[in-house]
């Protein structure tokens, strides 16, 4: 197949394929037209890479991964890694499908996306981010640099999570949510002690259009209402009503969100 390329006989490679040195392509891989692959890339068995994708250097595309048209993966990323769980982990143990990346997605350098997770179209995942297994992302989701998204999390379309935020397991972020840098979400009031914790493990729910300021902390199981505004550094211990600004430690309501800041006004 060419200098620097080792490809299994069962792999299918489209026209215009360009590659660097040391590329390994596994059994039953399918690569579309116009795909470019850097040096020292591994594409494991059963992965599908659609037309016009670009893969950087030292990338691993794990078995069963599906990359739709025009996906870009930067250097040193790992796409679709299977988890190896600790004995004490609360995450499910099951066979996972390959990761799915919708058309036009972009994945940053040194980012790890786990198997069983699905991204819609035009999502952006920044450098050094990590997204665990069984997560679901809508279209146009932005996950910033060094963000962690733990397992079994759902993120709605157009939601933005900025650098360094921590999204714990079992969280739901609806559409058009804004999460500022260094926000922390939690899901375990027992902090790892006693078997009782397994019955109460629950992440927060952030409803459509809510905004969470930098460094805020959201405690387990709380609900942030639609279009609510959480001030910088707030510690949210209780549910927050829709269209309400809360501040402080613990966070308390201070006033309604101004009408001109609501999504309907901004979109109108």
Labelled PLM ranges:
Residues 250-262:
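C-terminal end-helix/capping segment
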Residues 265-268:
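Phosphate-binding loop/pocket of nucleotide- and phosphate-handling active sites
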Residues 5-8, 12-13, 17-247, 252-253:
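Structural signal for interior beta-strand "rungs" in well-ordered beta-sheet cores
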């Amino acid at each position: 197949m060419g200098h620097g390329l080792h490809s299994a006989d069962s792999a299918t490679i489209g026209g215009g394929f360009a590659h660097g040195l040391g590329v390994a392509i596994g059994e039953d891989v399918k690569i579309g037209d116009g795909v470019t692959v850097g040096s020292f890339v591994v594409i494991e068995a059963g992965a599908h890479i659609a037309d016009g994708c670009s893969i950087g250097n030292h990338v691993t595309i794990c078995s069963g991964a599906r990359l739709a048209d025009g996906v870009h993966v930067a250097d040193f990323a790992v796409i679709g890694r299977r988890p190896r769980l600790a004995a004490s982990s609360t995450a499910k143990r099951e066979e996972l499908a390959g990761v799915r990346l919708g058309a036009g997605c972009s994945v940053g350098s040194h980012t790890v996306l786990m198997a069983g997770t699905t991204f819609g179209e035009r999502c952006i995942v920044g450098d050094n981010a990590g997204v665990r297994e069984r997560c679901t992302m809508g279209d146009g989701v932005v996950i910033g640099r060094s963000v962690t998204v733990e397992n079994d999390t759902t993120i709605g379309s157009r939601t933005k999570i900025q650098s360094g935020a921590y999204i714990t397991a079992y969280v739901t972020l609806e559409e058009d949510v804004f999460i500022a840098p260094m926000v922390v979400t939690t899901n375990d009031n027992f902090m790892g002690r006693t078997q009782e914790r397994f019955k109460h493990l629950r992440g927060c729910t952030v409803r459509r259009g809510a905004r969470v300021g930098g460094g805020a902390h959201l405690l387990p199981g709380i609900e942030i209402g639609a279009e609510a505004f959480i001030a910088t550094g707030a510690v949210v211990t209780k549910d927050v009503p829709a269209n309400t600004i809360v501040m402080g430690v613990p966070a308390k309501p201070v006033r309604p969100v101004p009408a001109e800041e609501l999504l309907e006004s901004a979109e109108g």
